[in-house]
Amino acid sequence: MKSEIKNAQFLVDGKPFRILSGEIHYFRVPREYWRDRLEKLKACGLNTVATYIPWNLHERTKGTFDFSGGLDLCSFLETADELGLKVILRPGPYICAEWEFGGFPAWLLAEPGLRLRCSEPKYLSYVKRYLEAVYNEVRKFFTRNIILLQIENGYASYGNDMVYYEFLKKLADESGYQNVLIAADGDSDIRITTEVPDGVWRVLMCGFSNPVPQLELYRKRQPDYPQLIIEYWDGWFAATGETFKMRDQHGIVEHLAKALEHGAHVNLYMFHGGTNFGFMNGALRSGNHYRQMTTSYDYAAPLTESGDVTELYRKFRELFAKYNPEFSAETPIPSDLPKASYGDVRLDEFAELSENLDVLSVHPQTSVYPLTMEEAGGDFGFMRYSAQLPAQSIPIPVTITRFQDCGFAYLNGKYLADFNQPEATFTIPANQSGTLDIIIENMGRTDFLCNLEDNRKGISGGVILNHQRFHFNWTSAPLPMEDLSKIKYGALPEFPVQKRPGFFRGRFQVETPMDTFLMIPGGSYGFCRINGRLLGRYNKSGPYYSLYVPATFLKKGENTVEVFEQDYLARPMVRFADHPNPDMKSFSTLE
């Protein structure tokens, strides 16, 4: 299989090929559901699937690569090939995607002098190792179904280092890949006029208006190339605490129709959004304003977070039937997977965080100043900082300088205060001595804009006592919250439990595992686990009030649900429903 561009036409094996693509991120979808989502993509009239590749999952530990289980990229590509789908591969190294740190591994931030997305030598050495590992993994698909390979992502929105850009192209050229290379950018003047390496097809990201004028600007910039919208935004992401606003879906369909009438190739971003399982949500920051992405990455896409067909899917399918000669409008649409309501589950066990800090701490290190999460070898979750304080005859104010993102403090295991960025100040009562524990949560690293390097989590400044001096000599330890097996659960305390961050556990029976949706009606803010697998964060401020639980997380018989509540749990129960809250299908404006 050979892809190429001749006379401003995209060819596959010497014949014109119209790219009608949809984006699905394999790492946001349970492996067991890859085929279901890809079959629905093909049944929508599409002939290609696009995916990013997250460096921070495949090389979470420096020098150790993982392409197994849910990260088995080759299995995803194989499934696509079996279904006759072409592939657009987008390996980064930066992916944005509302994903934690834009896909970069956190350990890059612990490297002295390293600078991101430029020709800084140390950064280039790590990029080379990562991309060579990816290319070695997928090489057999270079001649089977990978028709486009992206070498950078929105680089004109970040920098203009052509040495770096040429380095990425050279890595791709030397990998054995001989098909078309692309570079994705937005539509502003400064982005369009930024250079890309020779021989690289510049492709467009857009979706909020008629894309034809932007496509024409790209045509003028590269007259010998066709036009591809690599990200046609058919929905949008959601940030915690913000009101969800559904975009005008009539306009989305209408603008896509104009692009197709204009002759453009398209990739729907997203075709199926999926879920930011675990602590993998990204964030945005402007000054002191921090926006945390939600666990759900539903995106108001043609397929819902749980893979259900929407009215938008059906409208897109009608449209693509006009432009895909190999697709029949009579093709059946695969059925949605069954959902179950398992009802209310009582949380009848409790473990206070302060009493379990030692068993949750990983590789504690002592130092004069507190270590950042990255310096301490952590990446996701929380950080613990411990120090001994002498008693003082007066109350002592404590100020934490330069920290991310939020946290709370204990004195001798007793809850003292909570705080949020950008400032943290609390008071040690008079005549109190002992162990001060400060817990800082990484709520998600930013994934976009020029502040990517300002993503060091935990404490990057210091702790000042009485507004006068730093307190030195700290023990710093990551709390990844991945292994809770050593937590000591006990009986549920008398309710209400206020300002006692801790773990609640309950058990429930399942006869037939099916997809379901977990709700925490009395919860404030925290995260949930099912049978030891981390689902993700929840927040009473919305806009999503449920967590998607794939059937693959459940088992026949007894199941366990654990809730870590950081603030206040009003009721010791959770609920499993057969629909999400909100139900995104009910937002459709096309019915």
Question: Where do the PLM segments sit?
Answer:
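The substrate-binding groove and active-site-proximal loops of carbohydrate-active enzymes
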Residues: 19-31, 55-72, 109-129, 150-161, ...
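Aromatic-lined substrate-binding rim segments of carbohydrate-active enzymes
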Residues: 35-100, 169-174
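Catalytic-core region of carbohydrate-active enzymes that cleave or remodel glycosidic bonds
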Residues: 174-175, 205-304, 308-311, 319
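Active-site neighborhood of glycoside hydrolase catalytic domains
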Residues: 123-197
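N-terminal carbohydrate-binding accessory modules
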Residues: 1-48, 78
